[in-house]
């Protein structure tokens, strides 16, 4: 039998400045994986994390 889906989801967050900023230290897009609680956080997640391509802390938004 298949098990029931849990409440926690594994999601990917991506740097918002890497896509639009050509003045980066290195080419590429910063992505992190994290988990979120489906019941408590129903909307898209936004966190400030370090981006090695921009060389600073930036807002990372959830992508599908």
Swiss-Prot record:
Known Pfam families for this protein? Answer: Ribosomal_L33
Per its UniProt entry, which superkingdom is the organism in? Bacteria
SUPFAM superfamilies from the xrefs? Zn-binding ribosomal proteins
User: GO terms for molecular function, please?
Assistant: structural constituent of ribosome
Keywords of the record, alphabetical order, are: Ribonucleoprotein, Ribosomal protein
Which cellular component appears as one GO term in the record? cytoplasm
The GO annotation for biological process reads: translation
Family membership, please give it: Belongs to the bacterial ribosomal protein bL33 family.
- Put simply, this protein is called Large ribosomal subunit protein bL33
